[in-house]
Amino acid sequence: MEDIHWVAIERGTHALSDGRTIVAGTTDNVSYSAQNVNFGHQFSSKPIVLTNVASHGSGHLVDSDPKNITSSSFDLQLQSDQKRWGQNSTAVEKVGWIAIETGGSAGLRQLGEAKIVSAVNHTEKDVSFNTTDDAVIIAETQTLAGPDVANVTINNVTNNSVSVRITETNYHLTKRGEHGHHAYEDVGVAIFKKGLILCFGRGTEILT
C-alpha cells in the first residue's frame, strides 16, 4: 500500500497569496514527438512544470514529460516502456499541466514552496523546504536526459524535507524487483499544505 500525493488547480492563471503565479491548463493530441506549449503567461524566471496524462488513447501505460522549460513555454511529449509495448507513433493523449513560480515564504507555513533540484538520479536525494504543515509534495522531472521512461518517487516526507529519486518503469526490471540506473535529471518539487489552496484570479479585489 502506498500514499499518493496529488494537487488539482482550476484551469487558468492565478496568484497564490504569497504573490507567486500558478498557471494550469490542458493540451490535446500530445504524441511521442515533442510539441511546444505556451503558458499564456510570462513568468519572471523558469517555473517548475508538473504534468499528468488525462486520457487513455494508447491502450497501455504512458507517461508525459516536460522539457526545455523557459519562462514562457515548455516542450511536452509522451513516453512508454518500448521493451514491453513498443512505441505507437500514432497514439495521442490529453495531458494536464501546472506551472508554478519557484520560491516561497518561509514564515507562511500554509503556503509551501516550489523549487528545482539538480542532479537527481536513481539514488535517493534529500531535499529541504520551508516548514509546511501537513505537507503535500508533488515532484516531476524537468529534463529528459535518460532514454527510459521514469517517474519521480518521494519518500521520508516530513514538514520540512523529503527524499526524491528517479524510478524507471521498465517492465522487465520491475518484474525482477530491480531498479534501472538513470541519468541525472533536474526535478521540480512543489510543496503545498493539505487542503484548499487559496488563489486569486485576474481582477480579484480584496477589501481589508
Q: Predicted regions: what is each one?
A:
Residues 1-208:
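Extracellular receptor-binding modules and their adjoining Ser/Thr/Gly/Asp/Asn-rich linkers
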